Amino acid sequence: RGGRNQELVLAALAEAWDSGLDRLVILSGGTDGEDGPTDAAGAEVDQDLWRTARTRKLSPEPFLAINDSYTFFETIGGLLQTGPTHTNVMDLRVALILA
């Protein structure tokens, strides 16, 4: 369960997971408020959510393996839930690596 934006954020997190690159912010969402067959527009992860996942011993890999990014982000509080916006411009993606 999850959509392209949630999956993208989870895949990026998985790439950074073992590298220790935890000072980052990644956000991806659909401007129409929808991402796949879910009630979320996308997902985001930052340092706080990274720590939440680590504390709860949630690794992104098992969720990626079954394409269930929604449950991962629902568990750590990283879903972007805007509701339908009726404005479909494009997907918005932001990635910041903090110094």
What are these regions (language model features)?
Residues 2, 9-99:
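Internal helix-turn-beta structural module
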